[in-house]
Amino acid sequence: IVYICSRAADSLNASIDARRQGFIHACQTAETSHDLHWKVLEVPRDGGYADSALASLLALDQFPDAICCQTDTIAIPLIVRLERYDKLTPRDYSIIGFDDSQYADIMNLTTMKQDPFLMGRKAAHKALTLINGETLGQPHEIMHARLTLRETDAPVQLVLRDNDRAINE
């Protein structure tokens, strides 16, 4: 499994870095009970991020079964570029993004999303409370995410090679 991310801009580092750290923590935890191989690939924040991700993926010794992208805006152009190399989702790999962008539905991308309206409302409430000189009852909150399953993910199949024929188990 590969996590593709960019270096966070100072204004975005909390959310993006938390996603990366969450991925790393989950993989490190899963390593103890599974034969899990994982990697974090960092791509530039400029317009060449999808090409950089593509080059990094194709350079790996083994193409990953699953790709998790920091945002849908990395995942969607990557899907299109991988199709040019006959890498199709979910046949060859699964891919997931974050944020449920406007094109995620069109591309049938599986994605994670938080409720931006609720986040904005809670942030405004906290700001107004502080402006009024009051103490926050709950300064930190966990915002739940919703997984939207579409068509870019599938269970991993073990493929054994026997005289050039694949046997799926």
Question: In which residue ranges do the predicted regions lie?
Answer:
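Bacterial carbohydrate/catabolite-sensing allosteric modules
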Residues: 1-169
